[in-house]
Amino acid sequence: MPQPVSAQSAADQGRRSEIAVGVFQHGANFHPLGDRLIFDLPQLPPGEIYEGSEEDGTVDVQLLYRTAPLQFLLKPRLSAKVQISTAGRTSFASGGAEWRQHILRGRLYGQVGIGLTLHDGYRFTPDPFAAGLPAQEAQRRYDIYRRRTSFGSQVLFNPNASLGVRVDRRWSIEVAWEHFSHRQLFSDQNPGIDNIGIRLSRTLGR
């Protein structure tokens, strides 16, 4: 049975490393850093799709490790995570830092983070509309065009944020946002992608 969370136990657990597992919507229409949300895009002709939406609506599983807070630079936690597509789309591996702030005697917390990401997807997808392609090759490229996003770089930035509720001294539940893009630093192609999900986190140690 879950044990009540005291202010002291919440503080103690906040000084330990953590592991977490999450489920995310891959390609969610949510971006809090300035781009406006668009829910009523006009319908495109058959066979065409909006750039950056090729992978929208699929499901990812995320595995995450956080260190205990470091004792400098506002006490960040270093993080390592993999976000694996269950639909054969782009998967991500990231490393970074997260900063956490507790409220309500440690029962609730918010955190923001930034990281660098490598992915197994496409920097640029092959052009299915190039002249002179054999039909089989054109179809192969078109299938990629419909299902995979051109990120413009294999290295991406990963701003992220989450809100957590501590259930007991070891377990917490988080609602999380993960963004991947490169701000057009590496090429003009930069659709970016946003993911929204929920994580179950466990504090390590006794």
Model-derived regions: residue spans:
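Residues on the lipid-exposed face of transmembrane beta-strands in outer-membrane beta-barrel proteins
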Residues: V61-T67, G95-Q101, V112-L116, A161-R169, ...
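Transmembrane beta-strand segments that form the barrel wall of outer-membrane beta-barrel proteins
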Residues: I19-Q25, P45-P46, K75-T86, W177-S181
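Outer-membrane beta-barrel translocator/channel fold
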Residues: F24-L41, G110-N160, G164
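Outer-membrane beta-barrel "beta-signal"
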Residues: G192-R206
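Solvent-exposed loop/turn segments connecting transmembrane beta-strands
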Residues: S53-G57, V82-A93, L104, L118, ...
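Residues that define the transmembrane beta-barrel architecture of outer-membrane proteins
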Residues: R15-S17, S53-V61, R89-A93, S153-P159, ...
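Transmembrane beta-strands of outer-membrane beta-barrel proteins
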Residues: R15-V21, P76-A80, L108-I114, I173-V175, ...
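Short loop/turn motifs that connect adjacent beta-strands in outer-membrane beta-barrel proteins
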Residues: V5-R16, T67-P76, H102-G110, R170, ...
